[in-house]
């Protein structure tokens, strides 16, 4: 993937950029792997806003992605590399030898015509999926399961990758993009390689309208609102809110307590924190 920069023909185009899409080989999805996707606009079943800053945007269709990679022993050919509006990564359409078609996340160096497979006997090459116990230490992987058979949960976005640093009994140690080292069951599957489209993070969107096309509405600070709209609103002149940060409902915002997750016991080394001095 490369980035194409616009000429400054308008203020919105000045400095803006877009992906060049040179890796895309087809402009329409596989019909059998598409489902309708209805926009909720951040509302719940009662019509109340539960997630702010969502709404509008271009209509999308959801592409069904194979995150389990459980079709063992059946080789597949990469028929197309396609654009997916629902994620930052590109997706690859696989045609299996038995006639089935599936989508997977497209890793770096995977191209049209390549052969991929999954299972214990698969080769260590980009796009192949294996249990962690069968992947050599030091290999870069993505689309990793947290529970055996549960489907990929980690490292699925553009440019994401995780390194397998060690194996110790029933666990494999993975170094996350954040620097955290975590134990994962060696029976969990992972796909070899790094997720493609890594330059996605370098795109300059240029104008607010392009964010609206993506379904993102403006983010307004509470201190810029009136008292009727937010607990931080109002006051004479500019104020800092006058209290600890809260959400529009008045509940404390930010890091208010320590996390107590059952999976915390699997963390070997936590990521480096940016501590205030």
Swiss-Prot record:
Q: Which Pfam families match?
A: Ribosomal_L2, Ribosomal_L2_C
In residue numbers, the region (Disordered) covers 37-57, 222-277
Instruction: Quote a single Gene Ontology cellular component term.
Output: large ribosomal subunit
Compositionally biased residues, Basic residues: 268-277
What keywords does the record list, in alphabetical order? Ribonucleoprotein, Ribosomal protein, RNA-binding, rRNA-binding
At the top level, the lineage of the source is Bacteria
**GO BP of this protein:** cytoplasmic translation
| The keyword RNA-binding is assigned to this record | yes
The GO terms describing molecular function are: rRNA binding; structural constituent of ribosome; transferase activity
SUPFAM superfamilies in alphabetical order: Nucleic acid-binding proteins, Translation proteins SH3-like domain
Q: Which residues form a coiled coil?
A: none
Q: Which family does it belong to?
A: Belongs to the universal ribosomal protein uL2 family.
Question: What does this protein's UniProt record list under function?
Answer: One of the primary rRNA binding proteins. Required for association of the 30S and 50S subunits to form the 70S ribosome, for tRNA binding and peptide bond formation. It has been suggested to have peptidyltransferase activity; this is somewhat controversial. Makes several contacts with the 16S rRNA in the 70S ribosome.
Which NCBIfam families would you find in this protein's record?
rplB_bact (TIGR01171)
Subunit-structure text: Part of the 50S ribosomal subunit. Forms a bridge to the 30S subunit in the 70S ribosome.
Q: What is this protein called?
A: Large ribosomal subunit protein uL2
Source organism per entry reads Frankia alni (strain DSM 45986 / CECT 9034 / ACN14a)
Q: What is the lineage of its organism?
A: Bacteria, Bacillati, Actinomycetota, Actinomycetes, Frankiales
State the gene name recorded for this protein: rplB
């Amino acid at each position: 993937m490369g980035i194409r920069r616009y000429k400054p023909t308008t203020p919105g185009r000045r400095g803006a950029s877009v992906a060049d899409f040179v890796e895309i080989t087809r402009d329409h999805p596989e019909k059998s792997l598409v489902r309708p996707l209805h926009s909720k606009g951040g509302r719940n079943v009662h019509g109340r806003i539960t997630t702010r800053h969502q709404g509008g945007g271009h209509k999308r269709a959801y592409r069904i992605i194979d995150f389990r990679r459980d079709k063992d022993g059946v080789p597949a050919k990469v028929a197309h590399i396609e654009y997916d509006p629902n994620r930052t990564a590109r997706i690859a359409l696989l045609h299996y030898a038995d006639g089935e078609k599936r989508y997977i996340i497209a890793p770096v160096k995977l191209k049209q015509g390549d052969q991929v497979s999954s299972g214990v006997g698969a080769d260590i090459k980009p796009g192949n999926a294996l249990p962690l116990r069968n992947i050599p230490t030091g290999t870069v992987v993505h689309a990793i399961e947290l529970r055996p058979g549960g489907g990929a949960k980690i490292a699925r976005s553009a440019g994401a990758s995780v390194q397998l640093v060690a194996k110790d009994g029933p666990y494999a140690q993975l170094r996350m993009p954040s620097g955290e080292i975590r134990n994962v069951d060696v029976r969990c599957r992972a796909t070899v390689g790094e997720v493609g489209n890594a330059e996605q993070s370098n795109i300059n969107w240029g104008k607010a309208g392009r964010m609206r096309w993506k379904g993102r509405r403006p983010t307004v600070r509470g201190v810029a609102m009136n008292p009727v709209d937010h607990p931080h609103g109002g006051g004479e002149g500019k104020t800092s809110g006058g209290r600890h940060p809260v959400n529009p409902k008045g509940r404390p915002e930010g890091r208010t307590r320590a996390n107590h997750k059952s999976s915390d016991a699997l963390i070997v080394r936590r990521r480096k924190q940016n501590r205030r001095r």
